Amino acid sequence: MQKICRIALAVSLSVSFSIGSNYAFAQDEALNEIPLPALAPETQHATASKRIAARFTRGHYKKVKIDDALSQEVFDRYIKQLDYGRNVFLATDIAEFKKHSLDFDDVFARGKLSIAYSIYNVNMQRRLERYQYALSLLDKDIVSDDKAQQPPFDFTTKEVYAYDREDAPWAQSKAELDELWRIKVKADALNLILAGKEWPKAKEVLTKRYKYAIKRLKQSESEDVFQLVMNSFARVVEPHTSYLSPRNAER
């Protein structure tokens, strides 16, 4: 009887593992098939941005002059909010964006939001590429002679991971971004291992982390962009002021 129970338990566990694996695979496939949204301003955003700009220029306690200097400041803050660590955009992206840096007053004061949305869409694409690259690194783990999984990183090599890249130069090529992210993923893995996790568990944690980031990326909405643009403007005018979208205000 005990033998029969053990066999039944083994079969049950095997079936459960198979179902779980198939479900996880199906989820991954479903996520891969979801495209990035092509975000564009909604009808109400143009009116809202003009009203917000008017409130600041007419009703703020300090005089706000909408000119090229303010436009440049808002542009710089917008880019910083999109890529604070300078490990997503390429230098060529930034060079292209800078052509519109003095047009950002039209973005918030006249409701001509297409420039800001175009930049955001490029950011989403670059982030997707980075997370996909990070996942590809995790899949390169090594199987040792005793069949144990080992991390695909050499932790005996002396390398430096720069956490603060706020003032770092923009990457000149995809290869340069890849190297930045190789070291980032290596640092993420090392932190988990130092916290006591074996590599298989650390890999699982990082895989879930990067896949969740992709999922969140693909759930981006037009209102997310609008809030970021308006916050960039508001915080240049007054560092302690924020714009909260109606959707987020209800949470």
Each PLM stretch: what is its role?
Residues 1-9:
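Bacterial N-terminal signal peptides that target proteins for export
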Residues 4-5, 25-251:
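Flexible, low-complexity junctional segments that flank or bridge functional domains
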Residues 8-20:
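Bacterial N-terminal signal peptides
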